[in-house]
């Protein structure tokens, strides 16, 4: 499945992909990643992630970002980005990007893209997504959503 599991808030990307990249990574997108979006990730969105949303939620924090916590949640931080943490959450960072972390989370970086990480996370890279992931844009790619009104409250499968 791509996009998210609740049919809403695709964010700047969707699916298992990452912001400007691909894979189980992170950045400005949704899915297992983090940043601005939804899914198992964090940032602004809903689902198992945290930030301004619901689900397995996060710890202490404010704004669209995540708070301090671990496990399915996010680490310490604020804004659209993720904070410091581990496990399914995100690492340390701010902005639309992801912070430093490992596992299902993201690596170190900022902006719309992804940072440096390991495990199911993504490495350092940018560009318009590929594979199951989507890139930043007002169109659909690989059966997923880009950023745009038509993206919200829809779900797609591309894996």
From Swiss-Prot:
Record keywords, A-Z: Keratin, Repeat
Domain of life: Eukaryota
S-S bridge residues: none
Expressing tissues: Expressed in skin during two hair growth cycles. Expression restricted to the cortical cells of hair follicles, appearing first in the cortical cells processing the flat nuclei located a few cells above the dermal papilla.
Keyword Lipid biosynthesis: no
A GO cellular component annotation in the UniProt record: intermediate filament
Keyword Hydrolase: no
Region of interest (66 X 2 AA repeats of G-[YCGS]), ranges: 11-147
Main function: In the hair cortex, hair keratin intermediate filaments are embedded in an interfilamentous matrix, consisting of hair keratin-associated proteins (KRTAP), which are essential for the formation of a rigid and resistant hair shaft through their extensive disulfide bond cross-linking with abundant cysteine residues of hair keratins. The matrix proteins include the high-sulfur and high-glycine-tyrosine keratins.
Protein family according to the UniProt entry: Belongs to the KRTAP type 6 family.
Complex formation: Interacts with hair keratins.
Protein name: Keratin-associated protein 6-2
Organism: Mus musculus
Gene name, Swiss-Prot/TrEMBL: Krtap6-2
């Amino acid at each position: 499945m791509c996009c998210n599991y609740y049919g809403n808030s695709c964010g700047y990307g969707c699916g298992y992909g990452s912001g400007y990249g691909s894979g189980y990574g992170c950045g400005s997108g949704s899915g297992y990643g983090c940043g601005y979006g939804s899914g198992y990730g964090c940032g602004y969105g809903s689902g198992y992630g945290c930030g301004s949303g619901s689900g397995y939620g996060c710890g202490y924090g404010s704004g669209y970002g995540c708070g301090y916590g671990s496990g399915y949640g996010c680490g310490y931080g604020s804004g659209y980005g993720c904070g410091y943490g581990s496990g399914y959450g995100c690492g340390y960072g701010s902005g639309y990007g992801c912070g430093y972390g490992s596992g299902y989370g993201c690596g170190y970086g900022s902006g719309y893209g992804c940072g440096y990480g390991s495990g199911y996370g993504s490495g350092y890279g940018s560009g318009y997504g590929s594979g199951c992931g989507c890139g930043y844009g007002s169109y659909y790619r690989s059966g997923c959503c880009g950023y745009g009104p038509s993206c919200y409250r829809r779900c797609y499968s591309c894996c």
